[in-house]
Amino acid sequence: MGKKPITSAQVRTLRNNVKNKPLQELLLNLGVDLMLRSSDLLNLKVSDVVSDSGKVKSEVKVKQKKTGKTTLNIPLSKNSINSIKKHLLGRELDSYIFVGNKSHYTKSPITQKQYSRIVKSWMSSLGVEDVNNYSTHSVRKTKSSEIFKQTQNVEVCRRLLGHANITATSQYLGLEDSDALEVARNINL
């Protein structure tokens, strides 16, 4: 099944835990909302979420590095919009969103390894025993897993994740025959 998604309850707790940590707040909120692979998320620039006129965009569209496809216009939640207003307005539009403490030297985004360490520290702060069940992919899976749980619509998840086919999305979400049978049991005609 791969890495576990972060649950809605865990996200709410984490949002409270990171509210005074700009980098982590932005990673959590934008990571959950945009459902991007870490390579695409970390390479976002301020101009991807803030317009030339200095207003926060309500939707974000990104060209995915792995597939070369452009995502749908993914809506930003109030949490992401507030994080952007709080931490990014006034920054140069061509600067990376996710820069670490040494950014004034490198101007580069944090690495995937740094992001992975942050995710594991989040899970550790929640008291999760085996943090190795979580990774940056857990953040990408979080919203799509919740969408599937609420709608049972794999096609919607496929489109949002930018997968080429439903088989990949089913595997990604960890769906098995037992899940299909459970849905069938719950539908009475």
PLM regions: where:
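Conserved catalytic core of the tyrosine transesterase superfamily
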Residues: M1-L189
